[in-house]
Amino acid sequence: MAPHSVKSQFGSRLRQLRDERGYSQEELAERAGLLRNYVGGVERGERNVALENIVKLAKALSVTPGDLFSDFSR
């Protein structure tokens, strides 16, 4: 996988926001109604995230879905 793929950039941003809030992957997963290994896969850029799950993750982090894309390279 390319180091700057959309999935890896999204995963890095998700990890950054999770770390800023002091959440573990397990805590974020629970707040979002997802599985911990799913969240881990997203953070590693291994998962293609459905729109519904982007919204769930954003709500769990108290951000907008757009905030999950704010640090993307062009």
Predicted features and spans:
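A detector for short, charged/polar N-terminal pre-domain segments
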Residues: 1-9
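Short, charged recognition helix plus adjacent turn
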Residues: 2, 59, 69-74
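Short basic helix-loop element that most often maps to the first helix and adjoining turn
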Residues: 12-27, 31
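Conserved hydrophobic/aromatic packing and binding residues within compact polymer-binding modules
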Residues: 14, 28-29, 39-42, 68
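Short coil turns linking two alpha-helices in DNA-binding domains
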Residues: 24, 35-38, 50, 64
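Recognition helix of helix-turn-helix/homeodomain-like DNA-binding domains
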Residues: 33-47, 73
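DNA major-groove recognition helix of helix-turn-helix/homeodomain DNA-binding modules
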Residues: 52-67
